[in-house]
Regions:
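Long, serine/threonine/proline-rich intrinsically disordered regions in eukaryotic cortical polarity
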Residues: 2-59
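Long mid-to-C-terminal assembly/interaction modules of large eukaryotic proteins
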Residues: 515-516, 524-526, 532-549, 558, ...
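HKD-type phospholipase D/PLD-like phosphodiesterase module
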Residues: 71-114, 118-401, 412, 418-419, ...
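Compact beta-rich and alpha/beta scaffold cores in large eukaryotic transport/transcription complexes
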Residues: 456, 654-656, 662-666, 670-671
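N-terminal alpha-helical scaffolding segments that mark the starts
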Residues: 24-27, 58-59, 67-75, 82-85
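Ordered core of a single globular domain
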Residues: 413, 428, 435-436
Length: 835
């Protein structure tokens, strides 16, 4: 049991007065209760005054004293972070969802006392291992339910979205998780979920925050192990290194990988009604999913306690701001930190208990000697998100690491919006200035130096970029272009003004994937014979695997047994029908995405059970959505976390973020521009594995990671880098042969995708008139072949030429147009939302 530290509560009455008068005692208790209610009501009303006093958490003497203490702590640390540099860690990186979620499932199952989870979005129905039909015990809610029933205390903070703008439905998350252990059942009360911030001051008296989000993604287990990175525990994130687009399985829908809402393409359609997680309005037989590329890591060591402290500070801030008079939510205390630093309050009449963590004695000395990885937590936090003065140590870390780089800076990020100075308003963060400084210094020293940036081709929001509704998306793209290479104040513009050729020093790339939907003649014949549509069979399968007994459907979302019965009957009838009009001697794979990696086959060698026209209809492409937030410099240092490269993530007082700086004291003998070099094991191998994936030098992944050391926890086995002679080309990041290969593959892949699909955005589209001419005909579905008349043999031969997923970022897209029009949705008041 947790140590419950009871606060001092005012005695309800003198013992000598009531001891022999039970009737008077009851009256006095009622009067005392009424007094408490009046005090609470008075304070609730008093909070309305905060509307006109945005500094209300920092204007009293005791609050200013706490601010002073926090500032002194931060000023004594590198990057002015709340956390110091700490040594002696074990660390493990995870690239893409399979490895990360596999390891997370292992860790959650091992929890004995306490779990902290912070997410922008959390889907209780998410399967951490695949395929779901064979991994029924590996769903998030089933794991958390088991741990809660075993006595583990689970604390979760999720972003409370503005419902008009986002569809993640945190209310469903909260109610679904709270109802896992109803009153009277084992584990009741062991799962507590907070939603923050509020958007209505009259709701619970909390501050109103409309524009900014809790964007962190991290998990702490028993104060011994932590996960941190770019992956929310939610739909749409689970993926493999080959980044498949297809999930159609003629043999049996039990082989489906992404059931229900988990199959998503944000460029075509945003998530819809996620509380009805079994359904999906995006047809798997017509459209490919949007693959998801991400990076995270797990650590053991002293910095785990810093992540725990960040969580507890956020929890107590939300408790004070929103749940102060809700007895279901306790104040959290930590053994190693003072209450005032943690934001713990001791009101006269407290509601909820005071719980001190961890529940077991800490051996800090042992935690500091586990390995040789040095780490430091950095964050973006401020008054609205954390109850503190603004901290932007993530931006400080980015700037310092970039300026100190001697050989290269490699960035993967969801966005790239930054300024080189004060002349790019409304953009404020100056990471761009640090990039200019690093390149300028290298140029003056005649030193080879490269900045390589990989970002999505287009932000992951639904809609045709020509539509008025896409004005916000175009605004983001416009800010990115003006940060990178458009205008005299962009990074490239500043460099040109200094007489420096930017092409020599900085390059921008993206990722794209292809696949073939496995809608075969066999499926069509089955539909004819049974009268059951394949989409209905998929819905039935999703209903079966996502509606296990003992797992609640959440707030108001119970199961309809009659509907379920008929759905399962249809599915059984469809799958029992094994008749064939004619035998097929061709093997048809459910996905051919693996052919872009180190595979034994190429697309031209793939068989298909159907005619050529049907196969052509099934060939699709989509951008591989880069959601990673990674910076690596000189094979020495890495920054990984939740922070995008834009104002929202970097300023501190907009979105809240948490990232970690990694420096591994384990070194490897390496090369840098042909010279002998001592590289950091962690940073060098993270970069190499990312580049091998992007260049197609890795083999595809299986769904099952049970024997893969890349999906284990820190300290439980080394990586398997699957190296061969060809893949070693990435070892020297400044190798000219590598750079030639990188650019050639990006160029070739870009041209092939352009010829086959006419993908938007593209350098051939400089005006909206070009856009109209370039786009496929209206009857061509999004992501399908541009020219249906091209012979199949020619299509597949061209696909053979695609290696990996690397493509060039289109620097000239709509260069002759004003991309963002000022109006109601985009103006001086709202423009900071898009930066």
């Amino acid at each position: 049991m947790a140590e419950r530290v009871q606060s001092e509560r005012q005695s309800s009455h003198p013992t000598s007065f009531t001891g022999n008068h039970p009737h008077l005692e009851k009256i006095h208790q009622k009067l005392h209760h009424a007094k408490v209610e009046i005090v609470h009501f008075k304070h609730s009303i008093g909070k309305l005054g905060n509307i006109v006093n945005p500094n209300h958490r920092h204007d009293e003497e005791h609050e200013q004293e706490v601010d002073r203490k926090r500032s002194e702590i931060a000023e004594s640390h590198r990057f002015e972070s709340f956390a110091p540099i700490r040594e002696g860690h074990l660390a493990k990186f995870y690239i893409d969802g399979r490895d990360y979620f596999w390891a997370l499932a292992t860790a959650l199952e091992s929890a004995k006392e306490v779990i902290y989870i912070a997410d922008w979005w959390l889907s209780p129905e998410l399967f951490l291992r695949r395929p779901p039909a064979y991994s029924e015990n590996d769903r998030v809610d089933t794991i958390l339910k088991r741990r809660a029933e075993a006595g583990v205390k689970i604390y979760i903070i999720v972003y409370k979205e503005v419902e008009a703008a986002l569809t993640c439905n945190s209310q469903h998350t909260k109610h679904a998780l709270h109802e896992l252990c109803p009153k009277g059942s084992p584990g009741h009360g062991n799962i507590r979920v907070m939603r923050h911030p509020d958007h209505n001051v009259f709701d619970r008296g909390g501050d109103m925050t409309f524009y900014w989000a809790h964007h962190e993604k991290y998990c702490v287990i028993d104060h011994e192990l932590a996960f941190i990175g770019g992956l929310d525990i939610c739909f749409g994130r689970w993926d493999l290194k080959q980044h498949p687009l297809a999930d159609v399985h003629p043999e049996t829908v039990r082989n489906e990988i992404w059931p229900g809402q988990d199959y998503n393409n944000n460029r075509i359609m945003d998530f819809q009604n996620v509380e009805d997680w079994k359904q999906n309005q995006l047809s798997k037989t017509e459209y490919g999913r949007m693959p998801w590329h991400d990076v995270a890591l797990a650590i053991r060591g002293r910095s785990v306690l810093d992540i725990a402290q960040h969580f507890v500070e956020t929890w107590n801030h939300a408790k004070r701001d929103k749940y102060k008079r809700d007895g279901r939510y306790d104040w959290l205390q930590l053994e190693w930190a003072e209450d005032d630093i943690l934001g713990v309050q001791h009101p006269r009449f407290p509601v909820g208990d005071y719980i001190k963590h961890p529940l077991h004695p800490l051996n800090k000395e042992k935690m500091e000697k586990l390995g040789k990885v040095t780490t430091q937590l950095v964050r973006s936090s401020a008054d609205w998100s954390h109850g503190i003065l603004t901290e932007h140590s993530i931006q400080n870390a980015y700037q310092e690491v970039i300026r100190n780089a001697k050989h290269y800076v490699y960035i993967e990020n969801q966005f790239f919006i930054t300024a080189t100075g004060e002349k790019q308003k409304p953009i404020i963060n100056t990471i761009g200035a640090a990039i200019v400084d690093a390149i300028t210094t290298a140029h003056s020293e005649n030193r080879k130096f490269r900045v390589i940036v990989i970002i999505p081709l287009v932000p992951g929001f639904a809609g045709d970029l020509r539509d008025k509704g896409a004005n916000g998306t175009r605004a983001i793209m416009d800010y990115q272009y003006k940060s990178m290479f458009r205008g005299e104040h962009s990074i490239c513009g500043i460099l040109k003004g200094k007489g420096i050729d930017p092409v020599k020093y900085i390059s921008f790339f993206s990722l794209r994937s292809y696949d073939r939907l496995n809608r075969t003649e066999r499926i069509e014949k089955k539909e004819e014979r049974t009268g059951v549509k394949y989409e209905d069979v998929q819905h039935a399968q999703a209903h079966e695997v996502m509606s296990e007994e003992g797992v609640t459907g959440g707030h108001g979302y119970g199961k309809d047994e009659s509907v379920q019965y008929h759905m399962q009957k249809d599915r059984e009838a469809f799958e029992k029908d094994q008749k064939e009009d004619k035998p097929h001697d061709k093997e048809t794979k459910d996905s051919i995405a693996q052919d872009a990696l180190k595979s034994s086959r190429r697309p031209s060698e793939e068989g298909f059970q159907g005619d050529e026209e049907l196969e052509k209809e099934n060939i699709v492409t989509e951008q591989c959505y880069i959601h990673a937030k990674v910076l690596i410099a000189d094979d020495k240092i890495a920054i990984i976390g939740s922070s995008n490269l834009n104002d929202r993530s970097q300023l501190g007082y907009h979105d809240s973020e948490l990232s970690i700086v990694i420096e591994d004291q384990n070194t490897v003998d390496a090369k840098m521009d042909g010279e002998d070099f001592k590289a950091s094991y962690f940073a060098a191998h993270l970069r190499r594995q990312l580049w091998r994936e992007h260049l197609g030098l890795l083999p595809p992944q299986d769904l099952d990671a049970s024997g893969d050391p890349n999906a284990t926890l820190p300290g439980e086995g080394d990586y398997d880098f699957q190296e061969d002679e060809r893949s070693r080309i990435v070892e020297d990041p400044l190798n000219d042969e590598l750079w030639d290969t990188w650019n050639r593959q990006a160029h070739d892949n870009t041209n092939i995708f352009r010829e086959l699909f006419h993908c938007i955005p593209d350098n051939a589209v400089k005006t909206f008139e070009d856009y109209d001419k370039f786009l496929p005909k209206e009857e061509i579905k999004a992501g399908h072949l541009f020219n249906p008349e091209m012979p199949l043999k020619e299509v597949k031969k061209k696909l053979d030429g695609i290696r990996g997923h690397l493509v060039r970022f289109p620097t000239e897209f709509l260069i002759d147009e004003e991309m963002a029009e000022r109006g109601l949705d985009f103006n001086e008041i709202t423009e900071s939302i898009y930066t």
